[in-house]
A protein has these predicted regions:
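Membrane-proximal alpha-helical signals and transmembrane carboxylates
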Residues: 2-10, 14-218
């Protein structure tokens, strides 16, 4: 085999170990898709001892099954997500998470640990959309949305209509991280939970020095 052929094989072998997050976060580690719980929304709330993490799939089997929702409390997001693996037979896969929803209390304490988790975790993606729930907890909102369809379906509908809404702009974890690195300030779409259990746009959460300091109308 020519030298170039060997180089291609070596690159193929070592790229998954190189930390190329953007390229390989979609690979499900050779597991069968049927044996995996593909989480699409992650919610993080503040507790007295650390955080509560709520993970939800979308609606399943073309609407025939409600979303699967898992919840764990731990001292860190990574510990809570790891504990979820013991809740069922399916492997909990976070590589399909498209939305990260933060409760207001957690956001006021600081959003940086949640963003750092996304940045460092091998499955999570930097293009994940970021939201702050105004006046409530992310986990409760995810549970309420599941009574209608799922948080994933509702947020994806808002994201698709973002160009048509004057009070809603998509923001990714990567974009907010870049803002914080450059000037310490940023803004994140705010949501409220409507009476019908639907997530609704509520302007923007204003972030200063990595923490929620107030709200702005869209």
């Amino acid at each position: 085999m020519r030298r170039s052929g060997w180089m291609v094989l070596l690159l193929a072998a070592f790229l998954p170990l190189s930390g190329c997050k953007e390229t390989f976060d979609f690979l499900p580690y050779a597991r069968e898709i049927e044996d995996m719980a593909l989480m699409r929304t992650l919610g993080v709330d503040l507790t007295a001892e650390g955080v509560r993490v709520t993970a939800s799939t979308g609606i399943q089997d073309q609407g025939a099954k409600p979303p699967t929702i898992l919840e764990e409390e731990a001292r860190s997001i990574s510990a809570a997500c790891l504990s979820m693996q013991a809740q069922g037979a399916a492997y909990v896969f976070y590589g399909h998470v498209g939305q990260l929803l933060l409760g207001e209390d957690l956001a006021r304490q600081g959003i940086r640990p949640a963003l750092d988790y996304v940045m460092r975790d091998i499955e999570m993606r930097l293009e994940t959309k970021l939201y702050v729930l105004q006046g409530g907890e992310a986990g409760a909102a995810i549970q309420a949305a599941a009574q209608e369809d799922s948080a994933a379906e509702q947020l994806e509908a808002l994201e698709a209509d973002a160009g048509l809404l004057s009070d809603f702009m998509n923001r990714t974890v990567e974009e907010v991280l870049e803002d914080l690195e450059e000037n310490g300030d940023s803004f994140v779409p705010a949501l409220t939970l409507g009476e019908n259990g639907r997530l609704e746009p509520a302007g923007y959460a204003l972030i200063q020095d990595g923490a929620l300091v107030g709200w702005a109308q869209g």
